[in-house]
C-alpha cells in the first residue's frame, strides 16, 4: 500500500516536519540517537538530523525510505534507513535517546507490544514523542485511519504506555 502511495515525484506529506515535532524535538537529549517509527518519506527524520541528532528511520516502504535518503542528501545530512515491519521490529535495550512516532497508526495487536517495549528501548532520560489521531478524528472527513483500532486516546495511552511517565499535550 505505502509503496504505491509514495511512488510519485512529489512528497505526499511535504518535506518540512510537523509543527508538533518542531515544538517538542528539543525535549530529546541534544545530539542523541533518535528512532523515527513509520517515517515514510523522511521529513521528520531529516529535520532531526539537521538539529544534530543521529537518526534512524524505520518504515515498511522501501520507496518512502529511498525518498527519505534523497531528501537527507539534498539537505546535507545523513539518516540511517531501515526497511522493516514494525510488527517484527526489535527496538533494543537502552538504545535511543528519543523515539518519535508521528502519525504512526498501528493496529492494537502491533501497537501494544511496541508500546510495551518503549521503556526498555529508551536510555535513562530518553523521550518518546507521539503525534497521533484520536477516535474523534472519525467524525471528520479529513486524513487518518478509518479504523478506530488504529487510533489512540488518553485512556488508551495511559493503559498501553506502562512504565513511562508522560504528559498529554
Question: Model features per residue range: what roles?
Answer:
Residues 149-169:
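Short alpha-helix
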Residues 87-98:
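A short acidic, Gly/Pro-enriched loop at the edge of an enzyme's catalytic core
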Residues 1-29, 136:
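Conserved class I S-adenosyl-L-methionine
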Residues 61-63:
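Conserved SAM/SAH-binding beta-strand->alpha-helix loop
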